[in-house]
Amino acid sequence: MEALKNTILEKTNKSLGVNAEDARLTLTYLSLAFIVLFIGGALGLLQGLNRAGLLELPVWLNYYQILTAHGVLLVLVFTTLFMIGYFYASLSHTLGGLLPKVRKMGWVAFGLLVTGVVFVVTTIIMGEASVMYTFYPPMQASPWFYIGLVFLVAGLWVSGIGVFINAASWKKRNRGKHLPLLSYFAVGAFVLTLLGSLGVTAEVLMLIPWAFGWTETINVMLSRTLFWSFGHTIVNVWYLVAVSAWYVTVPKIIGGRLFSDTLARLVVILSVVLNVPGGFHHQIIDPGFTQGLKFMHVFMSLSIALPSLMTAFFMFAVFERAGRKKGAKGLLGWFKKLPWNDVRFLAPMIAMIAFIPAGAGGIAQTNNQLNQVVHNSLWVVGHFHLTLGTTVVLTFFGVMYWLIPYLTKREMTTKINRLGIIQTIVWAVGMLFMSGAMHWVGVLGSPRRTSYTTYGDNATALGWDPYLFFLAIGGSLLFLGVILMVYIVFNLMFFAPKGNTAFPIAEPEDNASVTPRWTERWGLWVIVAIAVISMGYVIPLVDLILNAPPGSPPFKTW
Amino acid sequence: MKQAAYGLVLYIFLMLPPVTALAESIMAIHMHMQMPLFVIAGMLMTPFFQKKFPNLFSKWNSNGIPGIILFMIIVLYWMLPRTMDEALTIPAVEIFKFVSLPFLAGVPLRDSWKKLETRVKNIIYISLSAIFGFMAWLYIASPNQLCNNYLIVEQKTLGWGFVFLAACIFIYFIQTLFIDETEYE
Ligand code: HEM
Ligand SMILES: [Cu+2]
């Protein structure tokens, strides 16, 4: 009876469209996300102009305050808000509506996140937390900054548990069925988030008493290691969110089918199981780890490239099949048959193309010797503006063109489509300039996280100026892109004509093989992930704790 | 059969001299990475042996009990500090390690597991986590160096590795009690 009621509920949900209360939750998340993007982007522009020597920042809002806010707002807050909003809408659509309890958890998580952001931003503006988004000790921020971080993590936890509850309840009601693929991605992404947040939670709980002055010293290396177990993982979570849209929605948009349900689920499992120990590739130059250990972590880190390569294979196979179905001939004829003038395809497609150089750069810099050349230079900033600032963010933008009209029961107009194409091109060109310049000038030695200086007119430093000028041009284009995108999002939300927009979910091929049952064994995968994490972390952590030097007192370098 | 080929590749890779040298240079990697990988290589190769010698398995391991006992004996043997030392200093023992872990632990484990009753599986989970817990205590608490080849701090590291392994197995076991897989299928 219960089951029958629920299938009816799901059917009505699919034909009538989204549940109004679920839509309100997601729209709230997305509105705040794009407001945050606007602020973060404006700060980015200020940084770009400063670095080119075109703009001097006032003392009361200096470069490092802005940089901290830019990093936290964009890499942590914008992405988190987007992920929760997008996945809650996905659950609502594919599982027949959110459970009332889970919807409430979504609102609680929102409250926690907003509280956290208020704490963090206030302390940054007051000039008491210019510690960058990595908040490495022994630099010490106000304790309220760290307390804000606790709220942010708590928000992630509450929203994640909500996802698990909704998925488990669906599974109970639908015995023998596989969780729909998009919800499966949501579960995987939140499992990875929770696993990744364990280390940083421990770190922040050590930093808070230190920041209040209750403990005198802090173990610097331990903190950095715990931070990167999170920092690395969370970026891969954002990537997984983007990948979910590539697998599930993009094939539908181009009139193709799902390539392989099993392969997609395998990618999720591999991402969850292998990811967390990858954090060490951010510490290749750190002292305190033996050479042999660092060498072994190169493999750990490269193994994460495996699911990415599988994804690339999968996507190109889908494109080729879709193109051939439309009558494409020859080796590359399918390429022309793709709907290039549809922004819902163009944006994620450019996102995927950007991942080719981005992934190659990542594989390069995870090698010890190559890392020494680019470590802490602007190269690294160029790298993650490609991976995160382009691959992930452009995919998020691409989702907006159908998700918002779907939620508000409106339709995207051809005008907005055209504007979206312009936005995508502006973003791509802006990033080409900014990230390209950052990569190049980084190899020439220009450091990251350093406001404009010529080092007393040193010749080498002066030689960076032309590249930094290109960086500023790219940054200005990007800010134009931000303005366009924010305009598009709010236009779609409030002014687009009423109508019906579908939530694009690709169907499997007619002759698709059945998905094996082992993909649903989350109990096993979580345990395997914990085992892999302990294999990666036990050795260095025990060493860092047992052989620790005396801890460090706090420093305020700004 | 593809699996068996992967298993063989992994097996050979693990025995390459630079790989063994690196893996054995760190105590925790020696015991918690190299040795389990040998077992996994054996598990991957199992289908090959099952196809080649079907009678052997049905005759000697019909209910899975002999296989799992053999597995436990081999695993216990390699958990002793002394055997690790000998593997490093006596070539014959090193070769025994290369043979015993895949073929006398990995193969019987995979052949037995499907045949075992739930009750026996539960006993295995509990005893493995208990043994690992004991090893954790031994390696963390021992004031003496237990292996000639490894320092005390490495020993403690290994002990903490055992804490996590014991916890993993135990949590998995608890999870099987509470989450009935068939309920979700
Ligand atoms: C208008 C667009 C953007 C511009 C102009 C911009 C520009 C910059 C610049 C100039 C830096 C500082 C380089 C340094 O001194 O080290 C920076 C850092 C950074 N950006 Fe952006 N960016 C933009 C968008 C984004 C986006 C969309 C993201 C991520 C979603 C992002 C994430 C970051 C992060 C994480 C840092 C590092 C902060 C740190 O080193 O602590 N940025 N950005
Ligand atoms: Cu990383």
Description of each model-found segment:
Chain B
Residues 1-185:
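Alpha-helical membrane segments of multi-pass proteins
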